[in-house]
Swiss-Prot record:
Keyword flag Cytoplasm: no
Active site, per annotation: 341, 445
PROSITE patterns reported for this sequence: GATASE_COBBQ
The protein's name: Cobyric acid synthase
Species for this entry: Chlorobium phaeobacteroides (strain DSM 266 / SMG 266 / 2430)
Keyword Transmembrane found: no
Residues in the signal sequence: none
Amino acid sequence: MVNSSPVPGALAIFGTASDVGKSIVATALCRMFSNAGIDVAPYKAQNMSNNSGVTPDGCEIGRAQIAQAEAARVVPTADMNPVLLKPNSDTGAQIVLQGKVCSTETAKGYFLDTSLWAEAARKSLDQLMQRHELVVIEGAGSCAEMNLYDRDFVNFRTARISGAPVILVADIDRGGVFAQVVGTLAVLPPEDRALVKGVIINRFRGDIDLFRDGVKLIETLAGIPVLGVIPYFRGFRIDAEDAVPLSSKVDPSGAPEKGRIAVAAIYFPHISNFTDLSPLELDPKVELHYLHFPRSLRGYQALILPGTKNVRGDLDWLTSLGWAEKIREFRRDGGLIMGICGGYQMLGATIADPSGVEGEPGESAGLGMLPVHTVLEEEKCLSNAIGNIQGESIAVSGYEIHMGRTTSNGDCSSFLRVTARNNRPADDVDGVITPDGKVIGTYFHGIIDEPEVRCWFLRQIDPAYTPDAEERGRQESYDLLADHFSGYLDIPKLYEIIQRPCPNP
């Protein structure tokens, strides 16, 4: 449905490339508009990410859209990310359509005909625009991929049908910002080029005054205003969309710093929900290393096996590279090991995939550290759940996204007592923990987000651990992000673009 109102019902945030900061810009704007009293909601037609979450009504969408909904102070729904692609191989992905698993496709097969996905995305956008005053649309990748332009329903096609003005985001930190902006605009068709109303230069380092001439040059060459130059800022805790920025932190050359709790996490080829580890990464008393290639783990006190979208494939990778023996050695040395979702399955005795859910049918031997057996099934478990650590008065909350059913032979205790799923009472258990407390498995993503759980986990390593008194929660992080952007954006011009009264500074 084309928006015929003279006042835009949407604002589109597109990028000159992948990982220029579109998600963060959209999150900041959602909180800024919400703070101004605007009923705002996020939207991304198609997201390619293994970093997903569960909405309150049991649908799976990208973590970035859940964060944006939190920033906008609205309940996340499947309409905010109607098409989610979860890569499970170099050329294929599981397709989640409006919150539920739809099929598995190769990249070639997916792009042969995108009409089904485009229509679902359009319907979701219509729903959001009917329910909310303003929708902040996030684009995908570069908005000017000309070889895919006729099949791209995420960027300018969405802007056209919604009547959304477009703000173009460029990343100056990677260099070539003039070519990013001017080159992107140069290849766009005139009707789409006319929709672009401003530019945001993201991730600036140094003295902004030294870039004033650069701003003028971009405005002259592009013919549109630069709405702001946003300095690089790390002072907030907000879930990332995918593992692109994470890859630059993998396999650090140095040993863990003494005086901090050293935690290693295996960086699987198909790693998913790596935001499970973000609270550890942000804790000043913890040093977290993502490791892809095998090394001795003797300098670390804890090891985490995170989720993966291809459990048996990544288990084969783990074994073939020699990680399995390194992990067993770490176990013999008394290290603390936690497996989350796919990592939990790997720690078990066997993983069977009789239906070929994640690849070729078959069964794989696990690492054998937990007495559990997993069978992958076609129906995906999606839930938000709460409970407590067995034998402890520590409340836990998390979300489950998995296609496996794991059973224990009873030689270990259950890790969690589950008291509710999707707001319905439950009397269930999750995960296992060995008698010595050194190996833990759980399906709960986000479990370490809870300060009490994180404190409990780190005190298994260092009983004297105390959390940072200045730790910021998610809502405070959204406010900090909005304040940061507000300080560098041309707010009157931004409100002129969306044709709303500018709030008082």
